[in-house]
């Protein structure tokens, strides 16, 4: 995480129409961790009556009903709910949303699923004529997924890439090695599969997907080097490392920063660097 906004050509506003096939409904749960709030995504083919919802968000009846009414105003019936990962700000409302819409919930983690189908690497969701490709992006959490929407040259990244700042590697569930691999996987989508736009789980849409992902990779390398140097200088506890390395970050975010530091320390140990 960082207090400096990354490149990526972020839009000025959060919420509303993002691409030809996506509309964002912003949940009313702003905080230092969730930024403006959770982005709930309604995804559909323009000429289809069916829509997919990605990350219904927190258990907030008003928000869940707003998602349903927004879909209806677009002439869409919600047919499926997908989860990028299981954190409560993305998934807590999924059960109630399933009751409101009568839809199954698909996720990588079996504990989050409602219905007969989950999600697996290589799956393609085709509801209402859509093509949503499941992309494994563990690291923020072990169950983190992204969804590649080729028709809009976009990728919905959950918390793997945010629209502002950087994300936490939520140790011990999240692992830095996995996260770096996930960023490289997203980078490959921007280099070889035409992805230009990031539709994040929090914050504004990023119109320069490659620039955003490459910033994340560079930022992670920089933070890792800082942590390694801090250890070499004799700082021995995660809290000491946080105070030294994350001095530029709002102290309200230090508990999350400590999770990332623990993940970085594990990574350095695993690779024999400390």
Which ranges hold each PLM region?
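Active-site HxH/HxHxD metal-binding segment of metal-dependent hydrolases
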Residues: 35-36, 56-133, 153
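Short Gly/Pro-enriched turn/cap motifs at secondary-structure boundaries
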Residues: 14, 31-32, 116, 136-138
């Amino acid at each position: 995480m960082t207090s400096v906004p990354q490149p990526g050509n972020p839009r000025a506003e959060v919420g509303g129409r993002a691409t030809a096939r996506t509309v964002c409904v912003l949940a009313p749960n702003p905080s230092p961790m969730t930024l403006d709030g959770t982005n709930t995504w309604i995804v559909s083919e323009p000429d289809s009556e069916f829509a997919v919802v990605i990350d219904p968000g927190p258990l907030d009846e008003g928000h869940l009903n707003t998602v349903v009414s927004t879909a209806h105003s677009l002439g869409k019936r919600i047919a499926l709910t997908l989860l990028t990962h299981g954190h409560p700000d993305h998934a807590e409302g999924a059960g109630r949303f399933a009751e409101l819409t009568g839809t199954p919930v698909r996720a990588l983690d079996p504990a989050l699923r409602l219905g007969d189908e989950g999600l697996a690497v290589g799956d393609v969701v085709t509801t209402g004529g859509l093509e949503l490709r499941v992309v494994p992006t563990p690291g923020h959490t072990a169950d983190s997924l992204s969804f590649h929407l080729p028709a809009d040259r976009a990728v919905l990244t959950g918390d793997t890439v945010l629209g502002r700042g950087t994300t936490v590697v939520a140790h011990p569930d999240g692992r830095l090695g996995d996260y770096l691999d996930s960023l490289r996987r997203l980078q490959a989508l921007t280099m070889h599969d035409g992805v230009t736009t990031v539709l994040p789980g929090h914050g504004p849409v990023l119109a320069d997907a490659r620039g955003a992902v490459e910033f994340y990779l560079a930022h992670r390398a920089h933070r890792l080097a800082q942590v390694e140097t801090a250890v070499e200088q004799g700082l021995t506890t995660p809290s000491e490392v946080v105070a030294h390395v994350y001095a530029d970050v709002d102290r309200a975010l230090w508990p999350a920063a400590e999770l990332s530091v623990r993940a970085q320390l594990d990574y350095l140990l695993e690779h024999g660097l400390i």
